Every structure is written in C-alpha cells, then in structure tokens.
Curated annotation (Swiss-Prot):
This is Protein kibra. Residues 1206-1217 have a biased composition (Pro residues). One of its GO terms (cellular component) is cytoplasmic side of apical plasma membrane. Residues 685-805 form the C2 domain. Residues 1-51, 518-566, 838-899, 1143-1169, 1201-1265 are annotated as: Disordered. GO terms for biological process: border follicle cell migration; negative regulation of glial cell proliferation; negative regulation of organ growth; positive regulation of apoptotic process; positive regulation of hippo signaling; R8 cell development; R8 cell fate specification; regulation of DNA-templated transcription. Residues 18-43, 522-543, 850-862, 1218-1249 have a biased composition (Low complexity).
Length: 1271
C-alpha cells in the first residue's frame, strides 16, 4: 500500500440518479483515457533502476521504490513527460504531482501529491481569486448602502423630533384655547380645529416612530449580513491556500442537509402558525362586525344574484362529437401558442437579469428613499410657523433648509445620470413579469379546459409538467442554487422603485411652489372638495355611462394614462387575464380574435354606487327581501358580443357578491335619465324563485329553503280561478324522495317559506344537482311549467346562501328520445375505451400491415376525437436539456403525484364509461364499414373545388380519408398510405427513431430519450463550486434557519396575544388586526380562503423563476464563471426577509424601548392634561358668569377662591424639554396663558430638579391676578 494517502470517498450507487450515474461513467472513462495516454507516453521511457509497478486492491496503480523502501502514487517518469509548473501547462495538462479525481457525491476534486492534500478548486483556474475580488467589491458597496440607511435613520429621527415639538406646541395652544373657550373674544383659534390638529400631530408622531423602528430593523439586518460575509472571507483566507479538503467538504455538505431538514420542518410550523393567525383574524373580524352591526348579515355569507340557468345552453352539452373535437383541437393549438409565448418571455427575462446587477436595485431604492425623506423633512420645516420662534430657532431652521436644498440638488444630479437607465431596465423587467403572470394564468385556464375534456376522454395533463420539469423537490444528495437562494419568504414584499422615484421627483418639483397649509384646514378643504365632486345632476351624480345598465365598456384605443381594466375570464381569447376577484372558469375556449371588451367589476360598481347614493341621502340599507331583479341585469350586455362568445357569456363558474336590492337601471330611472339597453327589455318578464341552501356538517344534512317566487305568470296564464302553484325539489340523479311546498293561488309573488332537511353525505352531495320544478294544479290536473337546475358541485358547504334563480320555461325545454347515453358522453366513452385498449395493448407487437389497416378506421375516429399523445410529446421535447449541474438534477415528485392522481381519475372514468360503449356503437351510424383499405371520402361540391384547391394543395393522409366528416376535393385527393395509424398520426419530423419491425408499439417511440452521444474526451469547461461557494451556501442556510426561528417566535407571540384578545373580545386588538396593512399582507400569504387557482399560480411563478435561472445559466459561455449567480449569492445576505408585524406597546409588555416608553409618558401627560383642562374650563365658566352678575371684584375673588379650594392636579412637564429637542430650540412652556395681555404676569418658574429623581421635574404655578385661580 502506498504511504502517501488520498482522501477517497467510496460511491454509493443506490443514492445516484441516472444523470449522476451517466456523469460518473463519463468521468471514469475520462480518467481511463488519461491513464491510457499516460501509459502510452510512459512506454517510451523505462522505469528507473530499483522501481517497480503494483496495483492496489481497487485497481489503482502505485509505484514501489525498493532503494528507499517507499511507495508513491507518482510515476517517476513524470519528470520527463509532464510539465513542472502550471506556467508550462498547455491545454488541460496538470503539472507534475497533481491528479484529478472524481467522487460521486462531491464531483471533481484535485489531489496534490507533493503537499499530500486535496482541494475542491481546479488549480488551473483563477475563479477563486475572481470571487474574492467580487466579495470585496460588494462589501464596499454594501458599506455605502449601510451608510445611506444610517443617514436615512438620522433624517427620519430629525423629522420625529420636529413632529414631537410641533405636537407639543399644538398641545400648548390647545390648553390656552381651552381656558378661554367660553368667550369668543378671547379665543384666537377654534378649539375643535385645534383638537383635530392635535390628534393628527399625535398620529404623525406615532407613524414616524413605527417607520423609525422599521429602519432600525433594516440596519440591523444589513449589518448582520455584512458581518456574515466578513466572517466568510476571513474563514476562507485562514485556510491553507484558501481551500477546503475533501473531508471538510463532505462535512459541510452533511451539515447543509441537516440544516435543510430543520428548515423544512420549521417551514411547516410557520405555515401552521400563519393558518392559525388567519383563523383568529377572521374570528376577530366576525366579532367586530357583530358588535358594530348585529342586524346586518355577515359579509362572509356571500349573496349572489348570478344566473344559474344557462339560457344559451352549455356548449359542452350541445356540441356534437365533431364540434367538440374541433373545439378541443383549437384549445390544444392555443395551449401550444401560449407555451411558446411563455418560453419567449422566460428568455427575455433571462436576458434582463444580465442588465441589472443583483443588489443594485436595493441600493437605488435606498438612495431614492433617502431623497424622499429629505424632501419630507424640507416640507416639514417649510410648514413650521416662525412667528412664535426665537431668533436662534429661526437661524437653525433656515440653515437646515438651505443644507437640505443643496443636498437634494446634488442627489438629483447624481441619480438622474446613473439611476435612470437601471430603473428603465427594471420597469421593462416588471412589464415582462406581468406578461408572464398573465400568460401563466391563460395557460392554467387552458389546462383546466383540457382537463374538462379529459373527463369525457382519456386526455390528461399535469400542472406539474405544464412548463416542463419545473420541479420544486430538491435533490436527495445535494442542494441546488434555487433550493437555497430562491425562497419567497426569504425576501420581503418588493417596493415599486419606479413609482417611488416618480413621487420623489414630483415632491422635488413642487416643494418650492407649495405653501404651508394648516393640517386641519387641509383636511377640511379635502372634505369640501370631495363633497363638491358629487353633483346634483342625475347623470353626473351616478358617474355612469350610457346606457347605465350595462357595465361593459368598448375600449379599442384606451388612454395610456388610465389603468387598463381587466377582462372577464369568459372572454379569455382576446385578453387572457381573469380578474383577481373571480375564480377562473374552465373555459377560455374559442380562438376568435374578437375586439377586446373591457368589463367593469360588478362588485366595484355596486360599492361605488352605494357610496355615492349615501352621500346624496338616497341610499337605503341592503335588504335581501327587496324586490328581486333579473340576475342577468348584473351581467354585461350580450347583444353586442360576437356570436362565438354568446355560448360562454351567460354561465360562469363565479358567483359574485352582489346584492339584489339596487341595480344601475333602477337608480337611473329614479334620477330621471332612464336609458334601458336592449338586453334589459325582455328581462322584466322573467320568472324567478328564491332558494336558500345550507349544509350542516355535524348532522350530515342539507337544508333546502324554498322561500318565494316572483312573476310566475310569465310561465303560465291561469285558465281558472282555482289554479294553484307549488314547488317540487329533488336531488338528481337517483333521487328516491322529493320535497314539495304547499300550494298557493298567488302567481305574482307567492311566499312559500318551506324548509326541508335532506340527509346526505358531503361527498355525494357534490355529485348531485338540485332540480326545482314549478308545478301548477288545476283541479286534479298537474302541469310542470318551469324548471330550475342547480349544480351542487359549485355549492360551498361552508357558506349558507340565499339566491334568486331564473326559471326556465318548459316550452323551451326540448324533448329527446330516451337514449341510454347522450351522444357526447358516448363519444367520450368510446374515446376512453379506445385509448385504454391501446394502452393495454402497448406491449403487443404488430403482426402485419393488413391487421393494422383493418383497425385503422376505428382508430382514426378515436385519434380525431382526443389523442393526447402529440401534446405530451411536444411537452417532453420542449424540456430544456440538462447540463449535468447539481441544480438541474431535481426530482419531479410533485409531477409524479399529479400523474398518479390523474391516472386514478381516468381509471374511474373508464370503469364508468366502458359499459356504455356497446350502446353507443349500436346507435352511431357508420358510412363505411369494410375491412379493407378504404379510399373513399366525402368530396366537396363542384362549385367550391377551385377555391379549396387554391387554399390548400397539401396531400391528404390515408388515415384522414376514413373520417366521414373530412370533406376534401377530388382535385387534390392524393392518398398517401402509411403503414399504420400510429405512423400517420405522427408528424414526419417528430420521431428521431427509425422504423423497427417487431418492436413495441411505435407510438411510444416518440417518448424515448435521446440516444446518448458517443463519449469523447471531456474538456474542463465546467466551473466547479469553490470553497467560498460552499461556505456561502452553508452560511445562507444558517441565516435562513436563524430568521425562520425568529419569525416562528414572533408568530407564536402574536398568536397568543390575538387568541387572548379573541377570548376576551378586545375591540382594540381586533381593530389593529383588521386595519394593520403589514399584518394583512402576512396573513394573505397563507389565507386558505384564497382560491386554489391563485395558489397554483404562485407555484407556477416559483417554478418559472427556477426555470429562468436555468435558462440564464445556459447563456454563460462554457468555461466562463457565472458572475451573476455569485452576485446573487452574496446579495442574499443583505436582503430583508419577511417581516412579522409587532403589536403596539399598549397591547404587549416588550423589552425596554425608549421610543415606546416616551410614547407612554406622552399618553399619561395628555390624560392628566385633559383632566386638568376640564377642571379649569368649569372653573373659568363659573367665574365669568359670576363676574357679570357682581361688579365687586373683591367679593368675586373671595367667593371664587372659596369655591376653588380643591387644588387641581399639577401637570407634569411635557417630554419636549428632554434632550430630544433639536439644537437651538427652547423647551416650550407648559403653563397656558389666558390672553396675550396676561402672558407677562402668568409665567411658569421651573424648579431646579435633580437629574437622578425624575419626580422632582415639576413646575410651580402662580395665581392668575385676573381670575384668582391656579391655571
């Protein structure tokens, strides 16, 4: 055995994945190639005397020096065949004493036999020195960024001090005004206005303290990240050659995996805590709403007046087989186009990453925030009144103004040159991200549409594979870049830097033109301006369009300055984006390129309308029992839409939270400007039924309440006086019992008020449909005049609903022959069974051409119906090639779970539809049924042959001629006979494999992986991970774990406080939980009420970010280091993570915080001040009244002194006299003066106070000589 050892780690084949095994084989072949070449070079030179060759137990060659009795791995002939130093190396050569080795878990590493050490870095590359220089440059830039944050902290602190002083001045003015409020001649200010100003100033101080606390947290976060980076640099420099050996690399890797497991478990705890916070927040909201208005219904019980009766008919049910298959093919084409668009957007985003350096946007944001803080401070100084200031204060304020103006000018000149281009790139990136999000929404809608076809056929598509191997599952043997540094919770919600810069520029341009406006007057002017905007004109008061009943706006050329309105998801063909408040329907089908229709939100319209009506004193509280309107009146007008959109416009899966009390049309009629649209004219004749639904989970009972009906005369005219009407309901299908209301003779507005309980389990309920029929009874004769069909699949068992439903007249219900299976469902069953039979026979080999042609007719039909394989082949081919790096080796576990789920769904569908296939085949007509090759087809008429020939002269495939509906022209009927159905269905350029007779079914050949390329000599073009990379990854994991534990602790504390508040029904904490924006953003991340489509969209966005990272890595030239990824690594440590809001000081007992303690003292001072002020006002009023009655001043003073014998409580000194006051400003006096004339006589003399005893800081108050009382 050689005594010169190397740290060789044994591989574990059972932990390796196929790509790693292939990479290991390539590395082994490369090493064998080097050994063979080395042996060929050494064969020219014999071994020196006394040397011998031997092999170790693992087959590795070592050399024996018999003279010195030593063994070594080095060949003594290397001194003749290898270069001596790195400068002498050419190409991939290593100098003498160096060896390249490979470990399956770590990868390539290098052995220095001369120094008897191992290292991860390639000694031939200088990537490590480049990394160290980049780290040093970033630390200097981060130091500048930290200085900006500290300067921002100083400016914010100055704003806080000036705001506190202004608050104290207003408090003093309010105290003076309160003492002389009884006489209007003595008061210089309105007491109510001063009191409002005082509240505004106090809120401003409180807000500035919160902002100061946030900046403090940002500074501490940045300092911690910089300290971590400094420690990493020092740790690497302390190592020998700045490199870790293989044993240390293995230990670091194992530690990272352990930390990752802790992160996974901690994230589960955090998600559970956030879900608990969502529930507590909802409970607090319910308590507050119930306390404020117990008569109104809870907003969580949504009221919907959307039409549940599809008057236009469901497209999926009315389309025949051919139209449905054409619709599915069109959807597939749209899906393919959107996928190409997504790939294009991803590529553009990958290009934009190189333009914007990581961390530069954060630095620009800090610069702009600093400028904005200085502008706000300048505006605060400009708004300060200088009348009551001393000369020293005026001089300090003017100097501060001049300095701020100079700083702002310099900052704008510097930022306009360097920040403008970066912000333009950032704005372009944001636009691309918005487009990508809209494209993902559209792709998701199309996937749902394709899944709806899968319920009738065997086509299935997985959301996990929709974008091609975008797996979130991490590798079991290594952590990738995306696993460590791409974390949605590791980054706080971003700030729109572009908008921030625009606002800062507007402030800078306007601060000189703006005059100081009194806060109270400014608020009053705003209120007057808002009230003046509401005109008494009936048209302007509603702020509506003509016709007022239709919220649809046709906007072919929208103004770029106005925000674009989003489209209804039903018309996703023109513009794909569904509104954020709706659950996207599964139909963005038709590919008609119609003009875009911008639809206003119905909920938004009603809220704005209600608010304006309340201002006009026309609004009435919402009442569910009000006269019902047509639900379609809340929908857009259907008459202006293209015919292709009509099939989707009337039935959507969304139920809007809209009241039925007031409509746009009714209000417009009241205002005198009634312009009804064409779509509203026939709706007044609709018959409606009000039905309430509620499910009791504990009892397993569905409560059906048949309340009332409206305008049933539109369905049937009573022919006799004794005619009555009743409602009958049943859960279909397979309903054993039905429920029935009492019979009434009122056909206009009958009130039934009947409630029934139907025992049924929840899983069965969601598969049922509630059918309510309107039945008339004349004597012994009964007749069904209308029907309401309600799908329980859309019913939310968590909510109780009370809705109006349109009744479809029985005259419009067509009568069909009693078939065992509808044609569309039968066609779907045929597709399912055919696909299942083809899947079960996938192992069977094809015997001959004749047998294939025999079954080609039926298989052609099934292929035209729903062949999913082409799309799946396209998805498989569009997956990016793996480059062998560790972050491209993720297991797609989520995709496998989705596929297993879909397989189970398809299997259930096959079992249900298999028994119906025979019935369908008997009822279906077949034009051609011969078992030979059929070359007949349906030809076009003679008059259209020329036009058809001009349009398309492509040859017709043989398999297309078997479809009876495939009408072609005889002039271009060129039948191309392929061997089988699978070949004809396959595009000529899709399959890279040649024909193999006797192989398995060739349809699966399209999914074979590409043949492995011949293994050639591998060049060192891959930049491996260095020791600095490993240390940064480890510290990043530790940082994430530290902040995760901190978040969990804060969330746990917040949960406990909110739980106690919920149990005690504390209104203050409930108001904070509802109004705090930071808390609302926090719970919005884990709100279970968020629709599943939004959660899936967030997952897709996360996967797309990882895909963009992979695309960007492919743009890095081979052999060049990835500079952007390394910059992202080091900027990760200074990015602020998700912040957990902290409760105010009055709700909790946190550690000592000087800012919060000062706030508490101010509150106590204010309470004492108000008590003393009330006492003084009462005494002052009595004194003035007695002075008017008695002219004798001496008797008056004696009586008042006897009356005011109890001394009022003394007022402590306000905190403005603390060292927090700005330099050069005198502390404001706490002694209020009654009038300017008495200021000289009524003064406060401060008592010398001991600094160690804060209780001695009191003022002695003298007696006012005019009124004879203490003030």
């Amino acid at each position: 055995m050689p005594n010169q050892s190397q740290h060789h780690l044994q591989p574990h084949p059972h932990h390796l994945r196929p790509q790693q095994q292939q990479q290991q084989q390539q590395q082994q072949q490369q090493q064998q190639h080097h050994r063979q070449q080395q042996q060929q070079n050494h064969s020219d030179f014999p071994l020196p005397d006394g040397w011998d060759i031997a092999k170790d137990f693992d087959g590795k060659t070592y050399y024996i020096d018999h003279i010195n009795k030593k063994t070594t791995w080095l060949d003594p002939r290397d001194c003749y065949t290898k270069p001596q130093t790195f400068e002498d190396c050419v190409g991939d050569e290593l100098p003498m004493g160096w060896e390249e080795s490979y470990d399956p878990n770590i990868g390539l590493y290098y052995i220095n036999h001369l120094a008897q050490s191992t290292q991860l870095e390639d000694p031939r590359q200088e990537w490590k020195s480049v990394q160290e220089q980049m780290l040093s440059d970033y630390l200097s830039a981060a130091q500048d960024q930290l200085e900006n944050k500290r300067e921002m902290f100083d400016v914010k602190q100055q704003r806080l001090l000036w705001a506190q002083e202004e608050y104290n001045h207003l408090k003093l003015a309010a105290s003076r005004s309160s003492l002389c409020s009884s006489s209007s001649s003595m008061s210089r200010h309105d007491p109510e206005l001063l009191r409002a100003d005082l509240m505004l100033a106090r809120e401003r101080v409180h807000q500035l303290k919160q902002e100061l606390n946030h900046i403090t947290n940002d500074i501490s976060y940045t300092e911690r990240g910089m300290n971590t980076l400094y420690s990493v640099g020092e740790k690497i420099n302390a190592r020998q050659n700045g490199c870790y050996d293989i044993a240390e690399v293995q230990a670091i890797r194992e530690e990272m995996l352990k930390v990752h497991k802790s992160l996974v478990s901690g994230e589960k705890v955090r998600e559970e805590l956030m879900r608990s916070l969502v529930q507590i927040k909802n409970e607090l909201s319910r308590q507050q709403i119930s306390e404020e208005n117990s008569d109104l219904a809870s907003p969580f019980d949504r009221v919907c007046v959307a039409s549940q009766t599809d008057l236009c008919g469901s497209t999926g049910d009315n389309l025949n087989g051919g139209a449905r298959f054409a619709e599915m093919a069109k959807t597939k084409l749209q899906y393919a186009e959107w996928r190409k668009h997504i790939k294009k957007l991803q590529q553009q985003l990958a290009d934009h990453v190189e333009r914007i350096e990581p961390g530069q946007l954060e630095s620009d944001k800090d610069r702009i925030l600093l400028i904005q803080e200085k502008e706000k401070l300048l505006n605060d100084l400009n708004s300060i009144s200088l009348k009551s200031r001393s000369e020293e204060e005026k001089r300090v304020i003017q100097q501060t103004r001049n300095k701020l103006e100079e700083d702002l000018k310099e900052a704008y000149e510097a930022n306009n040159t360097c920040v403008a281009n970066r912000l333009r790139f950032h704005e372009e990136k944001q636009l691309l991200l918005d487009k990508l999000q809209e494209a993902l929404k559209s792709t998701k809608l199309l996937e749902e549409r394709l899944k709806s076809f899968s319920s009738e056929s065997t086509f299935s598509i997985s959301s996990g594979s929709s974008l091609g191997s975008l797996s979130t599952a991490s590798s079991k043997s290594a952590l990738s870049f995306t696993d460590i540094y791409i974390d949605p919770f590791a980054v706080d919600s971003p700030i729109d830097v572009v908008d921030l810069r625009r606002r800062s520029q507007r402030l800078f341009q306007q601060h000189q033109r703006l005059h100081p406006v009194h806060p109270g007057l400014q608020q009053q002017q705003q209120q007057q301006q808002q009230s003046s905007e509401v005109s008494l004109s009936p048209r302007s008061s509603l702020s509506m369009e003509t016709p007022p009943a239709s919220p649809m706006k046709y906007n072919p050329g929208a103004d770029p300055t106005t925000p674009a309105l989003k489209e209804e998801p039903t018309y996703a063909n023109a513009l794909p984006a569904p509104p954020a408040y709706t659950a996207p329907p599964p139909v963005p089908v038709s590919g008609v390129r119609a003009r875009p229709y911008d639809l206003d939100s119905t909920v938004l319209d009603c809220m704005m309308l209600e608010a304006k009506l309340q201002k006009l004193n026309l609004g009435t509280p919402l009442n569910l029992a009000a006269a019902p309107l047509s639900p379609i009146s809340e929908k857009p007008s259907l008459l202006d839409l293209p015919q292709e959109m009509l099939s989707r416009s009337s039935s959507t899966s969304n139920t809007r939270s809209v009241s039925a009390a007031v409509s746009n049309e009714s209000v417009a009629g009241d205002s005198g400007v009634f312009e009804a649209s064409r779509a509203h004219l026939p709706r007044k004749e609709l018959a409606q039924v009000q039905i309430g639904l509620k499910y009791l989970k504990l009892e397993g009972v569905l409560v059906v309440s048949l309340e009332r009906a409206n305008n049933l005369l539109a369905l049937w005219t009573a022919s006799a006086d004794n005619s009555q009407v009743y409602l009958r309901a049943a859960l279909l299908p397979n309903s054993l019992t039905s429920i029935r209301t009492k019979a009434l003779g009122d056909f206009q507005k009958p009130v039934f008020n009947d409630t029934f309980a139907v025992p049924i389990t929840l899983d069965k309920l969601l598969t049922k449909s509630l059918q309510v029929t309107v039945v008339t009874m004349t004597g012994q004769k009964e007749e069904i005049i209308g029907t309401v069909q309600i799908s329980m699949a859309e019913f939310n068992p968590e909510d109780s609903t009370l809705k109006w439903y349109n009744v479809l007249s029985s005259k419009f219900i067509p009568t069909f022959e009693s078939l065992d299976l509808p044609s569309t469902s039968a066609a779907a069953a045929a597709v399912a069974v055919a696909a299942s039979s083809s899947a079960s026979n996938s192992i069977r080999e094809e015997s001959s051409d004749e047998s294939t042609i025999t079954s080609s007719q039926t298989s052609t039909l099934t292929r035209n119906q729903a062949p999913p394989m082409e799309l799946q082949a396209q998805i498989a081919e569009e997956q990016p090639e793996q480059d062998g790096s560790d972050d491209d080796d993720d297991d797609d576990e989520e995709e496998d779970d989705n596929n297993k789920k879909i397989i189970r769904e398809v299997a259930v569908g096959l079992m249900n539809s298999g028994c119906m296939l025979d019935t369908y085949l008997q009822n279906m007509k077949q034009e051609f049924a011969d078992k030979e090759t059929n070359t007949d087809c349906a030809f076009l008429p003679e008059k259209s042959r020329g036009q058809s020939q001009m349009m398309d002269d492509r040859p017709v495939k043989r398999s297309q001629t078997f479809t009876p509906s495939a009408a072609v022209s005889k002039n271009r009927y060129n039948c191309r006979l392929n061997r089988s159905d699978s070949d004809s269905a396959m595009h000529c350029g899709v399959a890279p494999h040649t024909f193999q007779r006797g192989a398995a079914e060739r349809r699966s050949l399209r999914f074979h992986t590409k043949a492995p390329k011949s293994v050639t000599k591998l060049h060192h073009t891959h930049i491996p991970r260095t020791s600095l990379d490993l240390e940064l990854d480890l510290q990043a994991q530790h940082s994430k774990l530290y902040f995760l534990n901190d978040q969990i602790a804060k969330l746990q504390n917040l949960k406990e406080v909110l739980q106690k508040a919920c149990e005690n029904k504390d209104p203050l904490i409930a108001a904070w939980a509802i109004e705090n924006e930071e808390f609302q953003r926090l719970v919005a991340r884990a709100d279970p009420a968020k629709c599943p489509e939004e959660r899936q969209l967030q997952k897709l966005l996360m996967k797309t970010a990882k895909e963009i990272h992979k695309l960007r890595k492919t743009k890095v030239p081979k052999g060049c280091p990835d500079l952007v990824s390394f910059k992202e690594k080091i900027t990760f440590f200074t990015r602020k993570g998700m912040s957990v809001p902290e409760l105010p000081s009055e709700f909790t007992l946190p550690e000592a915080n000087p800012i919060e303690e000062e706030e508490e003292e101010e509150e106590e001072d204010e309470d004492e001040f108000y008590n003393a002020a009330e006492t003084a006002i009462a005494i002052n009023t009595a004194l003035v009244a007695s002075n008017n009655r008695n002219k004798n001043l001496t008797d008056h003073l004696n009586r008042v002194s006897n009356y005011a014998a109890p001394k009022p409580p003394t007022i402590p000194a306000p905190p403005a006299a603390s060292p927090a006051a700005p330099a050069g400003s005198n502390p404001p006096s706490a002694t209020p003066s009654t009038t300017p004339a008495t200021q000289a006589t009524t003064t406060a003399v401060p008592v010398p106070a001991d600094d160690n005893n804060p209780e001695q800081q009191r003022y002695d108050y003298v007696v006012d000589r005019t009124y004879g009382v203490e003030v």
